[in-house]
């Protein structure tokens, strides 16, 4: 058992943000991020949109979000983890529509760049699982954390890549904000985080509240960034152990 794992197991998650933390890059694969929002001032290091499998650079600061979803997700990460540096990879187009091909391309970019935490507040259908799985496994072996949302309404599966063993899948539960976790063993998605009426930044300015697994997922990504900032040698399987150990046991 590593010293980092033991220290992380003993840590108080609610006070980690007060430590001197190493900066951790967190990729947000979503509808884009409004990096000009005050809640994200100075927190977004790069912005791209992925179209037809190709990345296109976008000016920072600026509004790369055509829907508002990704800005909300990024603001949750930024609020909880002061050491998180947001890497914006827009895979969804206006109306929150996107293609599995663009999602796979964006994940490939994040994995190749070895971004330590990859937040995916979305779920692809099973037909894209064969393309997503090897990328998630490569990330795992490169000591990157892929954190992905469970479907809000499961339809035969919980969504991909959340179902993969190499990924930290996240559901939603009625829990105190912001770093409470629920651990339910023997489920395909063992971790839940708060996901009801989460205060988030709105693209274009102002604030709103959002509900869903999409907004529970960045809470877990933020905790991963905090833990990696405090204990940089934590490995993905250690991270899962720590998250589950800190969770209230359910089921």
Task: Show which residues each predicted segment covers.
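Mature extracellular/periplasmic domains of secretome proteins
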Residues: 16-21, 79, 98-119, 129-145, ...
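Solvent-exposed loop/turn segments at secondary-structure junctions
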Residues: 33-34, 94-95, 123-127, 152-155, ...
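Structural detector of well-ordered beta-strand residues that form the stable sheet scaffold
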Residues: 87, 145-147, 169, 199
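Extracellular S/T/G-rich loop segment that most often corresponds to the catalytic His/Ser-adjacent loop
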Residues: 159-229, 233, 237
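Subtilisin-like peptidase catalytic core
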Residues: 59-127, 231, 243-247
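Active-site core segment of subtilase-fold serine proteases
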Residues: 2-84, 200, 204
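Gly/Ser-rich catalytic serine loop of serine hydrolases
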Residues: 60-71, 153, 208-220
